[in-house]
Every structure is written in C-alpha cells, then in structure tokens.
Design a protein with these regions (language model features):
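Nucleotide 5′-phosphate-binding alpha/beta core
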Residues: 1-126, 132-153, 157, 216, ...
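Residues that mark the start of a beta-strand
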Residues: 162-168, 246, 414
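General small-molecule cofactor/ligand-binding pocket signal
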Residues: 196-199, 203, 273-274, 447-452
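Adenylate-forming
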Residues: 219-262, 273-281
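AMP-binding/adenylate-forming catalytic core of the ANL superfamily
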Residues: 222, 324-440, 444, 462
C-alpha cells in the first residue's frame, strides 16, 4: 500500500474513531440530535479544529496535488502562510475557468485529483456544463462517508427522518446526482428510514404513477424543488385528495417567503418546510426549523468566506459578496477556496440556536441566488427570488414564471407568467404590474408581462428555469 493511501485511510479511521462520522446507526429514536458531540461543540473547539484541518488539507494539496502546487506557486502562496483558519483569505481563489483549463489540457479529470486516490474513486459528480466544459468532483470512501454524515445530521435532527418514516427523493439525478442515491438515500438508510428514489425519471412523463406512489406509500418526508412541491400540491387539490407529506425539503434554489406560505396551503398535512442549499461538489447549508432563513453550516466540514467579485478582496461584515468555500476533508480532489458563485451577506450567527443548541454558525439571512443571476432594472438590483415573491401576490396565477434578462442594466423587467384565467384583459394586466412594481420598488410602466397558460413556463428537469439569460456574451 502506498504512503498516500495509508495516510488517507488513517485520516478516515481518525474521523470515525473521534466521532465526527457516526458509525453506530441508526441511533435510538429518542435521540434528538444525530451527533450531539459534534453538533454542539464549543466555539473555541470548533475554531481550533478548523485551524488544524485547514492546515492539513492545504499541506496535503501542496504535497500531493500537482494542480495546486503549480497554481499556488504562480500566485505567490505557500502553506506556511496559514497560521489560523481565518488566514484562509490568503489562499488564491479558485474558479471554474481554472479547472476547465486543466481539464482540457489533462483529460479526463485534470491534475487536481491525487493520482493514487483517483484510481479508487467511488463516485464522480459533474456540473451541467451549461456555461462551458463540465467540471467534475471525485469522491473516495472518506468523502462519501463524511458527506453522508452531514446529510444524516439534518435529516434526523430537523426533518425527523427515523425508523418507520418514508422518504421520497425527487431530485433530478442528472443535475443533482451527488444528492441522489449515492449519498442521500444512503444517509436515509443510516437513519433507518425507507427511501424512494424518484429522480431517475421525469416527474411530468410519469406523473400519474408518482402521484399514486405518494398516496399508497404515505410518504412522510418529500424532497424536491420548491416549484415542483407546489405543482404537486396544486394537482393533488384539483384531484380531490391531500398529499401525506409532513416535512417538505426544498432543494435546487431558495424558496421565496411567499412560496413557502403557498406550499403549506397546497400541502395541508405539512408541518415543516426546510430550505436545503447544496452543490454537486459537496457543500451544504440547511435551514434550522424555527429560524427562518438561517442556514447552518457544518464547520467541521468546510469554511466559507465572502469576497467582492470584482476585486476578490474580502467584504466587510454586513456587506454582500461572492461565496467562497473550502472543503476541509476532501482529499481525493481537494476544493480549496473555491468560488461557488452564490451572492450572500457576510453575516453569520454563532450563538447556539434556541431549539437544538447547535453551535455551528448559520447564515443570518437566506441565500438569494448566484452572482450571475443579479440584474438591474432602472438601477434597482434584483434577483429572481425577489420577483417570485411579487408574482405570488398576483391573483389567479400558478406561481410559475420566467424572468427574461437581456442585459445587466435594463429599462424593463420582462416576465413570462402563468395565469389560470382563460383571457387576460388590460385591467388584469395593469393590476398585476402594479402589484409586482409595489413589491419591487419599481413603476408599473417598468414591467412587461407575457401571459402564458399553466404548464408553459420553462423548466429544466425538476427545476423551474426562473432565469432566462438572453444577454449577449462579451
């Protein structure tokens, strides 16, 4: 066995023996927290742990990964510059363009994989490639084990996924594959639940069969996008039955506040609706029930920092910027100071949450979307999620819409919006524009609505395509 593989397996054993990855599962059903020892660590212990793990992953990447060694040397960075976890901002930011260059020059996976571990990859996830060459994330035994641990923490603690519960995962496997059977369903099994993987086929093409499954299996916890949650609830109401879901897990994009309210209307048995943010690469943050919009980050797994996307410099506390992430336990393919592209506020709450006593930091407000989704109408900075909240106030609509963005600075907000009305008169159109304008701080004349029939909004898999990008590439 090579020294690299020996070190990798030793770290894996350490993580299990120290209890960061729970190995005795499922727990007793009366345990409230999946991993109380880790989830309630003292702040000083978390900070010390992050410093140790950041130093370790940086040294590992320097010693074993050709890509990082070359890239960091070209930027004047060396591992001994890291003295504390807060020094993460000294590490050069890595963006997808750099990965794509490496992939193109060194197919199939580039030089960012540790060569010995690359031969032992358990699973490969890929981005859609919608903005260029797809990028990949390789998962070995350690990475899979830890990510399943992270999933189990929120599924057990927040969603009540325990023995006897039935969980249905309706995330499009082609777009969210690392959140499908390789990880999420296996996390379900750790919790002792029954898992139904529904993401291997399109809901729309097998709708009647899926609706029958929901009724027959009495699904307790249902995971899909906010828009599909709503569509399924609306259709069940029209068919004269109530969905059985008690917990709604909202993936694939933050749910607007008013969308959440609509979900409780169409799913009358639902007790919780929880925003779950994550990426194919293995990042995650989950909304704590009772703490609206506050998504907790497992700090033993990653470090976040926030920068000005124009300068790459850290933004001040309370300012907004681009989310940068460092995975602390991904050794097969490290992602260190990697740009996730989400636009967030640099404000985190570190006091224990009042319900569970979880000490890991949480975002002070929801993640509204990606940096490239930002657009401006008459100088007003907007995201699709802001438009969605406004659309939900318009009567006789399905809540399904597409924002058409034709420039970064626009004179008009153009929206394709589904209406249940057979005909749209000028008065209805005027009232809709007034409602949306009032919500967004615009004038009604600044808004153009293209009215479409239910089912005509553009979707990509299980996700509503809220952002139709028609900007010319420069």
């Amino acid at each position: 066995m090579s020294s690299v593989l020996q070190e990798y397996e030793a770290i894996h054993r350490e993580l299990r023996s120290e209890g960061f990855i729970r190995s005795d599962y499922p727990p007793s059903s009366d345990e409230v927290l999946w991993n109380k020892k880790v989830m309630t660590m003292k702040r000083e212990e978390l900070d010390k742990l992050k410093t140790f793990r950041l130093k370790r992953i940086v040294k590992w990447a320097w010693d074993h990964i050709e890509f990082y060694r070359k890239y960091w040397k070209s930027k004047g960075f060396e591992p001994d510059m890291i003295k504390d976890w807060k020094d993460v901002v000294k590490i050069p930011i890595l963006r997808k363009d750099e990965l794509r260059k490496d992939l193109s020059a060194n197919p199939p996976f580039g030089t960012i994989f540790e060569p010995e571990l690359a031969r032992r990859i358990r699973f490969v996830g890929a981005t859609s490639g919608s903005t260029g060459l797809p990028t990949f994330q390789g998962w070995g035994a350690l990475e899979m084990d830890y990510f399943q641990e992270g999933q189990a923490r929120y599924l057990w603690t927040f969603a009540g996924v325990k023995p006897g519960r039935v969980y249905a995962n309706y995330l499009n496997m082609s777009g969210f594959y690392s959140w499908g059977p390789p990880v999420v369903e296996t996390a379900m099994w750790r919790c002792g639940a029954t898992a139904i993987a529904g993401g291997g086929e399109t809901f729309f093409s097998w709708k009647n069969r899926h609706m029958l499954i929901f009724k027959l299996w009495k699904v307790d916890v249902f995971a899909t996008t906010p828009w599909l949650h709503r569509l399924i609830g609306e259709e069940a109401k029209e068919q004269g039955w109530e969905t059985p879901f008690k917990v709604l897990l909202l993936h694939g994009g933050a749910a607007a506040e008013k969308t959440k309210k609509k979900l409780f209307e169409v799913h009358p048995n639902a007790e919780l609706a929880i925003n779950v943010w994550g990426t194919t690469d293995g990042h995650m943050a989950i909304e704590i029930p009772g703490q609206e919009g506050q998504l907790v980050v497992w700090e033993d797994m990653e470090i976040f920092d926030i920068v000005d996307p124009k300068t790459d410099e850290p933004v001040a506390e309370g300012e907004r910027g681009e989310l940068i992430a460092t995975l602390l336990n991904h050794f097969t393919m490290p992602l260190i100071r990697y740009s996730l592209g989400d636009y967030v506020k640099n404000e985190f709450i570190t006091d224990p949450d009042p319900k569970f006593g979880i000490t890991h930091m949480r975002f002070a407000e929801p993640i509204p979307g990606r940096v490239e989704w930002m657009f401006s109408v008459k100088g007003k900075l907007l995201f699709p999620i802001y438009v969605e909240d406004a659309v939900n106030d318009v009567p006789d609509t399905t809540g399904m819409y597409n924002v058409i963005v034709y420039d970064n600075e626009m004179d008009k907000l153009k929206i394709r919006m589904e209406t249940k009305r057979a005909t749209v008169d000028s008065e209805y159109d005027k009232r809709a524009r007034e409602i949306i304008a009032s919500n967004l701080g615009l004038n009604p004349d600044d808004i153009d609505i293209e009215w479409i029939r239910p089912g005509q909004a553009v979707w990509t898999g299980y996700k509503l395509q809220v952002f139709l990008d028609q900007r010319k590439k420069k």
